[in-house]
Amino acid sequence: MEIIDNVLSEKTFNNIVNYTCNNNDFPWNLVQNGVSVAGDGKYQFVHEFRSETGVMSPYNYLLRNLYLRLGVNTLWRCKMNLKIKTKKTHVFYPFHQDFTSLQVPFTTVVFYLNTNNGYTLFEDGTKVDSVANRMVMFNGNTKHTSASHTEGDRFRFVLNINFS
């Protein structure tokens, strides 16, 4: 596992944030189940830059410099999650691997687009705080989960990338 701060230049990072997080016209889809248990009330909004079926978003070009920085050879999936601030206590989703059927080694990156008190938690107890322009890179088979944020901005933005 590797944690890297200031992943992108300020200009490149702000360009991504302005076109996605700060853009009222950026398209989001409501996902009510995801890795949660159906009916548990947990949900998030998602924009898929590259879906598991290979469909590419017209906004995928925004991430070109990030893909180059990561050394992406094959992009399996890339999605941005928008999570809404919760009251008083963190909400956790179940521990999961992003792909259980992928038969090749792959890397997962969680890239944080804003700073808040949400975080990524790993099954071994490691906690990585949501800090803007920070990423955590790890083996794709590593189980992890997210903790909602309870302070700061109304929304938490996280980019999730799976590649080899």
Locate each region found by the language model.
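Non-heme Fe(II)/2-oxoglutarate
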Residues: 1-74
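A short glycine-rich, His/Asp/Glu-containing loop-to-beta-strand
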Residues: 68-89
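Short beta-strand segments enriched in hydrophobic/aromatic residues
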Residues: 82-84, 113, 163
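A short beta-strand-loop-beta hairpin characteristic of the jelly-roll/cupin
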Residues: 88-95, 104-106, 112-131
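Conserved metal-binding segment of the jelly-roll/cupin
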Residues: 90, 128-145
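Short beta-strand His + acidic residue motifs that chelate non-heme Fe in jelly-roll/DSBH
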Residues: 94-96, 143-151
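A short hydrophobic beta-strand segment most commonly corresponding to one strand
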Residues: 109-111, 152-164
